[in-house]
Amino acid sequence: MKRTSRMFSNAATLAFLAAGVFALSAPLATAAEQSADDPVPTEEITAALKGMGHAPFPIGKPNSGYAQYFTGNSYLQPLAGGSGINVANVTFAPGTINRWHKHSKSCQVLVGVSGVGWYQIWGEKPQKMEPGTTVTIPEGVKHWHGASGGAWFQHLSIMLDGAGTEWLEPVDPAEYAKLNEAAK
């Protein structure tokens, strides 16, 4: 019983912070804010995202530390951390998704920022994510998320400091392909 109430408390706290970060940070940051020596094709990615609506957060650097858990290119831009909550903008190239995984010591709040993506909780149907879609994945629940087959996608990831990730098997490529085909 305590675990459920704590999980709800964490989820409620993270959802509240997600809304605040999204509302307050969007006017302050632009996707063009990258260092001059950064090899990321920032202008190309930003143009693609703006063509789908907007790109309010910096794209970040290649997510090379976690590349083995993604099917293609992803970029990570930390936005806040060190105060009990970690907030990052994750940018997925078209067709890029992560493996099935689960988090410990925190739920995960995902907030769609730009483009079109998917998330799926184990045993449930995949759900579309678009700008403004907010999802709370409870602690310990197996899931995946990422871009649709034909669009760039950005989401905020919000978790408590000290959260862990257990990476599991890849998403079935045939199931992902069917999902994208059905969405056309």
Stretch-by-stretch model annotation:
Residues 31-86, 166-184:
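A short, N-terminal "cap"/entry segment at the start of jelly-roll beta-barrel domains
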Residues 78, 87-91, 109, 126, ...:
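Conserved hydrophobic/aromatic beta-strand scaffold that supports enzyme active sites
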Residues 2-15:
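Bacterial N-terminal signal peptides that target proteins for export
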Residues 86-103:
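Conserved short histidine dyad/triad with adjacent acidic residue
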Residues 12-26:
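Bacterial N-terminal signal peptides
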Residues 118, 126, 139-165:
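Ligand-binding loop in jelly-roll beta-barrel domains
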